[in-house]
Amino acid sequence: MSLEAVTEPGKCSIDPNTKDLLASQHAGNNTPLQENSSAPRSECKAQDAMSKRQMKKFLKQKQWEDQRELRKQKRKEKRQKRKLERQAQAEHNIDANSRKRFRHEVQPSALRLIIDCSFDDLMALRDVKKLNKQIRRCYAENRRAVHPVQLYLTSHGGQLKSNMDEYDKGWINWKDIHIKPEHYKDLIKKEDLVYLTSDSPEVLSELDETKAYIIGGLVDHNHHKGITYKKALELGISHAQLPLGNFVKMNTRKVLAVNHVFEIILAFLEKKEWKEAFFSVLPQRKGAIPLTETGEQPECRASEQEDGEDSDSDSSIDESATIQPSVRCEEQNS
């Protein structure tokens, strides 16, 4: 017998939400459930009390049903999360294996590369901070290199050391680097030293891995032009410049930052070719363009190019890279 809501006075009414539940609970019972029976009020109260318990159970069941889609969505999100975690773990394992393989392919070079930090008193603090960043870049590049060099920091102290301590004391845990307070002449034989300076008349053609090449750790914006060359002469050590002018035409005469010189040497050790090494490192803002095999600049037309920053170091760029306007080369029809 179907149940219908009754609102007549003196008769018990059952909440519509409870109908189905009450009906199902009385299924199979020989005594039919009648909502609109004329029961006394005391009997109605007892039935109302029963209804509350049943209502609580019903609401709980209803809440469960209402949240079915939410639970389904949560299970889906959980599965997706586990899937992403498995993918991330797999990628991590691949990267780890790749790094292991890469480290197995690394062949350290015997070449020693020294950053001379003895110019501390010639730099303002802002330039010392720049040098600190360049040194950190050198260290990071050397750690990733196929042929890492034997990296030295010499005459380490003063403002530079204080700034490195302030910036991040983690440098004391750096690996595969020799950080020394001593001058390089007290650490390495004089005949093995070669100062890389843009003012040297000597031009490197190859790198001798039995030598120790020195990069001047100086950020001076050309305020102390030629100081590294003079220092090499005073100490009576060999000097040379990178063969940049044989392969590259620059839009201005600018010396390279410490990290650029360092990266060019790392690139040459890997590629064994100066031109490729230069163009894999030189920033575009320096307006570098290749020379032809005859050593002449191809026919080009002037174009606008954003001016770069001042040079950061007095190290090793070939001075024959003379001032030229920024250019864009056109392909010539034969």
Curated annotation (Swiss-Prot):
Domain spans labelled SAM-dependent MTase TRM10-type: 98-289
Acidic residues bias: start-end ranges: 305-317
Keyword Electron transport: no
Compositionally biased intervals (Polar residues): 26-40
UniProt-annotated stretches for the region Disordered: 1-101, 290-334
Metal-binding found in the keyword field: no
Coiled-coil ranges per UniProt: 62-94
Pfam families attached to this UniProt entry: tRNA_m1G_MT
EC number(s) stated in the UniProt entry for this protein: 2.1.1.221
Domain of life: Eukaryota
Reactions it catalyzes: guanosine(9) in tRNA + S-adenosyl-L-methionine = N(1)-methylguanosine(9) in tRNA + S-adenosyl-L-homocysteine + H(+)
Alphabetized GO MF terms: tRNA (guanosine(9)-N1)-methyltransferase activity
Annotated family: Belongs to the class IV-like SAM-binding methyltransferase superfamily. TRM10 family.
Function noted in UniProt: S-adenosyl-L-methionine-dependent guanine N(1)-methyltransferase that catalyzes the formation of N(1)-methylguanine at position 9 (m1G9) in tRNAs. Probably not able to catalyze formation of N(1)-methyladenine at position 9 (m1A9) in tRNAs.
Protein name: tRNA methyltransferase 10 homolog A
